[in-house]
From Swiss-Prot:
<protein>
    <recommendedName>
        <fullName>Uncharacterized protein R895</fullName>
    </recommendedName>
</protein>
<dbReference type="InterPro" id="IPR036691">
    <property type="entry name" value="Endo/exonu/phosph_ase_sf"/>
</dbReference>
Length: 690
């Protein structure tokens, strides 16, 4: 009936259950949030682009990235309190310490000092705390510096007569904050540290690098270690010495094996005095201000994300962020981008049962099963013919060759677990397959519509549209895959007739009767059943491109997909997405198609609890005849073109819509990308101590 019996294991490409399952990767990010974004003397500019205006974009970015551990630097007291209020409802434990100057280390609740802070936030669903502490970057690191006023006289650099601090050549003491956490899934301790290194003095940076790694390696006691933050490695001046000192003890993206993602640790601000230049391969010049180092772990992916003013909400706030007199035209919600890395435990990591004392206030309840497992799925319709090719000038500017860089950049930034793609030509699919394979994904492409037999793109040169399912190979293994046609006999391929203009005419104009009788072409739904190696559970995912014409055809297609996918997935979890075209406004579908699609599945509108993010499934292109309107709260009108629905998961926790933008012209791609982050049911899992 299908390509392969769902209960049959393909030995060649299915996971071997006799092997030891890998442990869930850990996503760690570092974000430097400058307390004073602009000169506060310019009151009007500061009001528009100070912290109160920037905070929503910072929150959106932290929400979007879905990190397990967040390292933060550069914030003042008010920012710390705001970040705590934002992160705690998402299940994070957040701790801050004084970052520098002659103040004793403390938590922010103990004092009202307004200097800069550093902090660590961790997901309580994934970790419980074992220990925490810190030390100073000075000759006697365990002795706090004197409690002296942090005034301008005291902060002068040594060469200008300032107080001798931090190994003698910088303007203030610096602090390292660390926490030792227990990873609940693996039962392995991991030590996490962060700091804000001094910006002045090569000697201080070199000595700080040596001290911090020696101390943290001793504290971690052979267990995995991560250290990151605003390390200010000006390697063009330092001659790589500080960086080489750090990498004697740990790795970053430049000396990690099997690493995918952006090969950079920081993208400089447009007119930042410490700006770094990016070449065509994404390689930075040797000034790396923000880095993440790791020891006893394997780097899987790295990425850079910016809280940008030019996202979905730009239209709502554009009058506020338009440059007044700011020549650098800042685009980010902070002076620096967020950097991140996904790390996997090495097989050699110790897997002993660790003795710990539970802290009831902020630790995981061990009487529960394993913490929920999160899956990030994205859906993107990448239109084949973006504009009329007869307009050669415009087509050359905004055709696929001009657009694909922004498509690949968007997917790399998001680093999703599953990617559903629609409306690609074979040449686009080949480009996407090469790109996705290179960053750790496997891809299955199939015919999307018209009267052509089912085949993968390697078997033919037909130029019709294709759909694709892509999965991260370190997370999933393929069990079986197949598809069916949206017609009365779904398992019978349509005839191999030419896909010409005459054949594609709608029925009312004399076209051939196809796809339940009221649209211009056959449509196809492809599916794949994958093994999630983190949970040992099978997940069925599917994608389709519904007919854009014909209410009856859309409704019958929804009924068929609902029935077929329920039969194919059985008791497995299901994720279904694509261009579903539920035109729910008056005179169209009247919610019938949407109701049928969600009859036994869920999207953001009928998720009962715990859902955060954009309350929208599609944001229309500005010239699209199916354009949807966005109100001030991000609510769409009832035309939802692109949808992701899911069944068998505990809840959808986040959704969002993004567009890969043309940086020079600020013109968006044809269709924004949509995404949902969902949690698998806790009772699907069996606790295993490796």
């Amino acid at each position: 009936m299908y390509d392969q019996d769902i209960n049959t294991i393909n030995v060649e490409n299915f996971y071997n259950f006799s092997k030891q399952l890998p442990i869930t990767p850990i996503r760690i990010v570092s974000y430097f949030l400058r307390s004073k974004f602009l000169d506060p003397k310019d009151k009007e500019e500061y009001k528009i682009r100070g912290w109160e205006s920037r905070a929503p974009y910072v929150y959106q970015l932290l929400n979007r990235v879905g990190a397990d551990i967040i390292l933060l630097q550069g914030m003042n007291l008010d920012q710390c309190k705001n970040i705590i209020s934002f992160l705690e409802p998402f299940g994070y434990n957040v701790q801050f310490r004084a970052a520098h100057s002659g103040k004793e280390s403390r938590e922010i609740i103990d004092d009202e000092w307004t200097g800069a802070f550093i902090g660590i936030a961790y997901s309580m669903n994934k970790f419980t705390i074992l220990n925490k502490g810190g030390f100073w970057l000075k000759e006697d690191p365990d002795i706090p510096p004197p409690s002296i006023a942090d005034n301008s006289e005291n902060r002068r650099s040594v060469e200008r007569g300032g107080t001798d601090k931090c190994f003698g050549d910088t303007h203030s003491y610096r602090y390292v904050f660390y926490e030792t956490l227990l990873n609940i899934e693996s039962n392995i301790p991991i030590t996490i540290g962060t700091s804000h290194f001094p910006i002045g003095g090569i000697n201080s940076r070199i000595k700080s690098s040596k001290l911090v790694m020696e101390r943290l390696c001793k504290i971690s006691d052979g267990h995995p270690l991560v250290f990151g933050g605003a390390l200010m490695l000006f390697e063009d001046k330092d001659g790589n010495t500080a960086y080489e000192t750090l990498t004697r003890y740990a790795c970053d993206y430049r000396n990690s094996k099997d690493h995918y993602g952006h090969q950079t640790s920081f993208i400089g601000y447009p007119n930042d005095p410490f700006k770094v230049d990016i070449n065509s391969n994404g390689i930075v010049s040797p000034r790396n201000l923000d880095l993440i180092f790791h020891r006893g772990l394997q780097s899987i992916r790295s990425f850079i994300m910016s809280g940008e003013f030019n996202s979905l909400e730009k239209k709502l706030v554009e009058p506020l962020i338009a440059p007044i007199k700011d020549s650098d035209k800042r685009q980010f919600a902070s002076d620096r981008c967020l950097i991140g890395v996904d790390l996997q435990f090495n097989r050699s990591a110790k897997k002993e049962i660790f003795q710990r004392t539970l802290n009831n206030e902020n630790s995981f309840n061990f009487s529960k099963n394993l913490s929920p497992k999160i899956i990030r799925t994205v859906n993107w319709n990448i239109r084949t013919s973006f504009l009329d090719p007869k307009d050669k000038k415009e087509y050359s500017i905004r055709g696929w060759q001009s657009r694909k860089h922004y498509v690949t950049e968007m997917l790399t930034h998001l680093a999703p677990d599953l990617i559903l793609l629609q409306e690609m030509s074979p040449s686009q699919a080949n480009d996407m397959k090469m790109f996705l394979n290179s960053i750790g994904y496997e891809v299955i492409f199939r015919t999307a519509h018209t009267g052509h037999d089912l085949y993968e793109i390697i078997d033919g040169e037909w130029t019709g549209a294709l759909t694709g399912i892509s999965y991260f190979r370190n997370r999933f293994f393929i069990n079986c895959h197949g598809g069916f046609w949206l017609k009365d006999d779904p398992h019978t391929p349509p005839p191999l007739d030419a896909d010409n203009a005459e054949n594609r005419r709608p029925i009312q104009e004399g076209g051939i009767d196809k796809c339940f009788g009221d649209t211009h072409s056959y449509r196809h739904c492809q599916w794949a059943t994958l093994l999630d190696v983190q949970s040992q559970q099978l997940i069925t995912t599917a994608v389709s491109d519904f007919p854009i014409g014909g209410k009856d055809s859309r409704l019958k297609s929804a009924i068929l997909c609902n029935s077929m996918l329920r039969e194919i997935s059985g008791e497995n979890c299901l994720i279904f997405g694509g261009e579903i075209c539920t035109f729910e406004d008056k005179g169209m579908d009247g919610f019938d198609t949407y109701k049928k699609i969600t009859e036994q599945a869920t999207d953001w509108r009928n998720t009962l609890y715990g859902h955060y993010g954009h309350q929208a499934t599609f944001v229309g292109y500005h010239t699209d005849k199916y354009k949807v309107e966005i109100d001030n709260h991000g609510i769409v009108s009832p035309r939802n073109i692109d949808i992701i629905v899911h069944r068998g998961f505990t809840q959808g926790i986040r959704s969002f819509s993004l567009s890969g933008e043309f940086n020079p012209s600020e013109k968006k791609l044809n269709k924004p990308l949509i995404s949902v982050v969902i949690i698998q049911k806790t009772d699907y899992f069996h606790q295993t101590i490796f």
